[in-house]
């Protein structure tokens, strides 16, 4: 923009693009030898302005400079804020965020782009409930998860968060996409009971960890791990926010040739069951790979079950075959379980 102290034609076009009314002198900008000279006779010499023209030119030029620098500062601030949103997290993928920003308005359309997720609740909600009740002493059939605190990671518009809240749990839903949280907040506001039980936050899992170490009875990451950047770090964070003995629930897509053909080619490109670009096959993870990450990080795999979606009926079913979708339940070891046999004797 500046060449040898002169504002180039490219710089002029940039100012005009920003909507500035540049002085006519910009067409032939004066040479500036010192940016510290902004007053008196020295300014008239540096800008090559005649003394009797100094007042008008000074006002016009300084006004343009102030506007330009102010605008550039704001642009730099916005750019820094945009980067900060993602730089604070090593698990959030900015490309994935942009994909779901464009889909935020569709969350609660049961016949729309997220219809398979609505239908998946028929499997994943009982899966979470039943496994949590194995270690629960609560016998309230109306609110079986009462007294439990659950973290729903990547909650989106709250499709799974709300059913868990209706079962009596206190649920915190987090998502890096502000548009998703806005939709979720709006939807829960129609139910006064859910409005009290559910909290939503625009943040990453790492940010939640800073204030919620060993705070949750369960962490849910449903259809999330295939979208994160650093899976091992993600699992480590899940472990750290769980109470000893807490449960981690994951539903995701296996990394197989069949999942590529049906999960991406057919579902996204041919049938349009899910929007194009929703999934990246390289990020799919097999049950074996997932277990190899969970176990060294203190999470013992209790259950792995296959799931299959019928696009014609719109329903999900359990299956022994995990080559497409599957659900996993892992448990963080309790404190006493870490003791050596000699110590626990």
Curated annotation (Swiss-Prot):
Cofactor: Mg(2+)
Keyword list, A-Z: Acetylation, Magnesium, Membrane, Metal-binding, Methyltransferase, Mitochondrion, Mitochondrion inner membrane, S-adenosyl-L-methionine, Transferase, Transit peptide, Ubiquinone biosynthesis
Family designation: Belongs to the class I-like SAM-binding methyltransferase superfamily. UbiG/COQ3 family.
Location in or out of the cell: Mitochondrion inner membrane
Subunit-level organization: Component of a multi-subunit COQ enzyme complex, composed of at least COQ3, COQ4, COQ5, COQ6, COQ7 and COQ9.
Organism from which the protein derives: Rattus norvegicus
Catalytic reaction annotation: 3,4-dihydroxy-5-(all-trans-decaprenyl)benzoate + S-adenosyl-L-methionine = 4-hydroxy-3-methoxy-5-(all-trans-decaprenyl)benzoate + S-adenosyl-L-homocysteine + H(+); a 3-demethylubiquinone + S-adenosyl-L-methionine = a ubiquinone + S-adenosyl-L-homocysteine; 3-demethylubiquinol-10 + S-adenosyl-L-methionine = ubiquinol-10 + S-adenosyl-L-homocysteine + H(+)
Main location: mitochondrion
The keyword Lipoprotein belongs to this UniProt entry's keyword annotation: no
One GO CC term on file: mitochondrion
Transit peptide, start-end: 1-86
Entry protein name: Ubiquinone biosynthesis O-methyltransferase, mitochondrial
Binding site for S-adenosyl-L-methionine: 124, 154, 175, 222
Keyword Nucleus: no
Residues the record lists as N6-acetyllysine modifications: 143, 149, 196
EC number: 2.1.1.64, 2.1.1.-, 2.1.1.114
InterPro entries: SAM-dependent_MTases_sf, UbiG_MeTrfase
Any single biological process term in GO: ubiquinone biosynthetic process
Residue positions binding Mg(2+): 223, 226-227
Any one GO molecular-function label of the UniProt entry: polyprenyldihydroxybenzoate methyltransferase activity
UniProt membrane topology term: Peripheral membrane protein
Biological function: O-methyltransferase required for two non-consecutive steps during ubiquinone biosynthesis. Catalyzes the 2 O-methylation of 3,4-dihydroxy-5-(all-trans-decaprenyl)benzoic acid into 4-hydroxy-3-methoxy-5-(all-trans-decaprenyl)benzoic acid. Also catalyzes the last step of ubiquinone biosynthesis by mediating methylation of 3-demethylubiquinone into ubiquinone. Also able to mediate the methylation of 3-demethylubiquinol-10 into ubiquinol-10.
Pathway the protein acts in: Cofactor biosynthesis; ubiquinone biosynthesis
């Amino acid at each position: 923009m500046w060449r040898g102290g002169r504002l180039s034609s490219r710089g002029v076009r940039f100012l005009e693009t920003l909507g500035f009314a540049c002085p006519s002198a910009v067409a032939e900008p004066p040479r500036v030898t010192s940016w510290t000279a902004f007053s008196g006779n020295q300014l008239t010499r540096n800008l090559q302005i005649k003394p009797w023209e100094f007042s008008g030119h000074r006002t016009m030029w300084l006004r343009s400079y102030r506007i330009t620098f102010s605008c550039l500062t704001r642009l730099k601030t916005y750019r820094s804020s945009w980067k900060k949103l993602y730089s604070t997290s090593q698990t959030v993928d900015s490309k994935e965020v942009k994909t779901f920003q464009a889909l935020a308005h569709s969350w609660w359309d049961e016949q729309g782009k997220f219809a398979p997720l609505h239908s998946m609740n028929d499997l994943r909600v009982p899966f979470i409930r039943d496994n949590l009740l194995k270690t629960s002493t609560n016998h309230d059939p109306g609110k079986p998860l009462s007294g439990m605190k659950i973290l729903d990671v990547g909650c989106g518009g709250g499709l799974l968060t709300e059913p868990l809240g209706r079962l009596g749990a206190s649920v915190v839903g987090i998502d890096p996409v502000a548009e998703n949280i806005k939709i979720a907040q709006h939807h829960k506001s129609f139910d006064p009971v859910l409005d009290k039980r559910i909290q939503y936050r625009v943040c990453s899992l790492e940010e939640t960890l800073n204030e919620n170490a060993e705070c949750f009875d369960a962490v849910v990451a449903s259809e999330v791990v295939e979208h994160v950047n650093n899976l091992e770090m993600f699992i480590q964070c899940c472990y750290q926010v769980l109470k000893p003995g807490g449960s981690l629930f994951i539903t995701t897509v296996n990394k197989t040739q069949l999942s590529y053909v049906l999960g991406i080619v057919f579902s996204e490109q041919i049938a349009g069951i899910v929007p194009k670009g929703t999934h990246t096959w390289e990020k799919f993870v097999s049950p074996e790979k997932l277990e190899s990450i969970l176990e060294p990080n203190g999470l013992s795999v209790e259950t792995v079950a296959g799931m299959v979606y019928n696009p014609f009926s719109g329903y999900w079913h359990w299956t022994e075959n995990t080559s497409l979708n599957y659900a996993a339940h892992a448990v963080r070891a309790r404190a006493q379980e870490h003791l050596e046999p000699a110590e626990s004797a």
